[in-house]
Amino acid sequence: IRDAQESRGLGDVYKRQLNDCGGVGVYTVESKEQYSLLSECAREAEVTIDVLLRVTSGNQFGLDEEDIKDIVKNREKYPELNIRGVQCYTGTQKKKFDIIKSEIEWLDGLCDSLYADYGFKAEELEYGPGLPVSYFGDAAYDNKYDMLKELAALLENYKAKYSITLEMGRYLVAECGIYVTGIADIKKNKGQQYVIVDGGINHVNYYGQAM
């Protein structure tokens, strides 16, 4: 795995960034191999950098909890890396606030266990809540600010414990632009009228839904 990462140029990317920016910024770690490689690059650049450990929700992204615990347990072996906390993003278009609430409680519980077991106090929590956006006037999204208000109220319970960063994604930018294209053809099949546009399905489809 390590050789594959280096052959893809991940090490070169880190080296270039560290040479250009020094220890500025925060790096998100997706794997134990990436953590080790980042440490080597930081050592060569003679800098100490801040990192967040991305915890997986069970998909291909991030580290599982056991890997995070192992990294934290052995953190003194990597003095070039300063672990600030954890990062998590599990998906988008969440219609139920209970899902968001349970995820934040889960992350808080993970941080508590890291402190109890290894004396590591997470300073930062970065989380993508996946708040929903209405693309086609779906009534389920009519009260678009209600969940945001619930989230703000929930985070009041944690703001003294962590520096919290929210990844708001499409909730902020979904209405920031429009897609303009031309009509190439209009036809009717079995009584259903279709408009053929000069664009690809990747332009009019959106994550988590079918057109």
Model-derived features: where do they sit?
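Glycine-rich beta-strand-to-loop/alpha-helix junction loops that act as flexible
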Residues: Y89-G91, L125-P132, M168-Y171
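Conserved anion-binding
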Residues: E30-N82, C88
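Short glycine/threonine-rich loop-to-helix capping motif typified by GTGT followed
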Residues: K96-S102, S134-M147, A174-D185
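Charged (often Lys/Glu-rich) extended helix/loop segments that serve as interaction or gating elements
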Residues: S163-M211
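Single conserved hydrophobic/aromatic residue that forms the stacking wall/gate
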Residues: I1-Y14
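Short, well-ordered coil/turn segments that N-cap beta-strands
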Residues: G23-G25, E46-I49, P79-R84, Y118-E123, ...
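Glycine-enriched alpha-helix->loop->beta-strand junction motifs that scaffold or abut catalytic
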Residues: L18-V26, R43-T48, K188-Q193
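Conserved, mostly hydrophobic/aromatic
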Residues: N19, L53, V86, Y127, ...
